[in-house]
C-alpha cells in the first residue's frame, strides 16, 4: 500500500513508500527518531536552528564560519551569531563590541585575526574580556603583521576569557 503524496492514517510509512528518496518535514512527527543503523553513505541535512546530539559526534573534518569585520567611527561589532572566526584589517583605532552570544550554559568560542595596516593602530577591548593576569596583550605594530586571539564564554557573554593564539605573524 503506497502513501506517496499523502500521509498514512492507518499504517506506518515504509521505505517502499518513499519513491524519490526524500522525506519531507511534514511527513515526520516532531518526536520521531531514526536509528543510526538506518543511515548510510553521505547524509546532507537541511535545517535551521540548533541540532542537539546525544552521545558522541565524530567528524573527519569540519568548517567554521568566517566573517570579515570592518570598522566605522572607531567601532566594530563581532556578531557571534554570524560566525565563529573573524578577520579584521585595522584601518583606524577601534573599539570592539561582541554581540549575540549564546545563552548562559552554552559554551562558545571564537577566534579573531587582526592585521595591522601601515599605521600603528590600537584596540580597545570590551570590559567583559578577562585576559591572562588581567592585562590586555600588546598588539604587533608592523605593517601587515597579524595577531590572533581566541575567546571563550559560557555565561551568555558576561565574561569572555581572552587568550593570545599568536602574534607578529605574517
Residues of each region from the PLM?
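A generic structural signal for well-ordered coil/turn residues at beta-strand boundaries
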Residues: 47, 53, 82, 145-147
Amino acid at each position: 500500500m503506497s502513501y506517496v503524496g499523502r500521509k498514512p492514517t492507518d499504517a506506518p510509512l515504509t521505505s517502499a513508500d518513499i519513491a524519490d528518496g526524500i522525506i519531507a518535514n511534514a511527513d515526520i512527527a516532531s518526536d520521531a527518531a531514526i536509528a543510526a543503523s538506518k543511515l548510510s553513505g553521505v547524509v546532507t541535512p537541511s535545517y535551521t536552528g540548533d541540532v542537539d546530539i546525544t552521545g558522541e559526534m565524530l567528524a573527519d573534518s569540519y568548517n567554521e564560519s568566517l566573517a570579515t569585520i570592518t570598522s566605522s567611527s572607531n567601532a566594530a561589532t563581532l556578531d557571534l551569531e554570524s560566525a565563529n572566526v573573524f578577520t579584521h584589517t585595522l584601518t583606524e583605532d577601534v573599539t570592539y563590541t561582541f554581540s549575540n552570544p549564546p545563552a548562559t550554559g552554552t559554551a562558545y568560542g571564537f577566534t579573531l585575526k587582526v592585521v595591522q595596516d601601515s599605521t600603528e593602530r590600537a584596540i580597545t577591548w570590551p570590559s567583559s574580556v578577562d585576559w591572562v593576569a588581567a592585562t590586555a596583550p600588546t598588539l604587533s605594530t608592523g605593517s601587515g603583521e597579524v595577531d590572533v586571539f581566541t575567546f571563550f564564554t559560557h555565561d551568555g557573554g558576561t565574561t569572555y576569557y581572552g587568550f593570545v593564539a599568536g602574534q607578529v605573524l605574517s
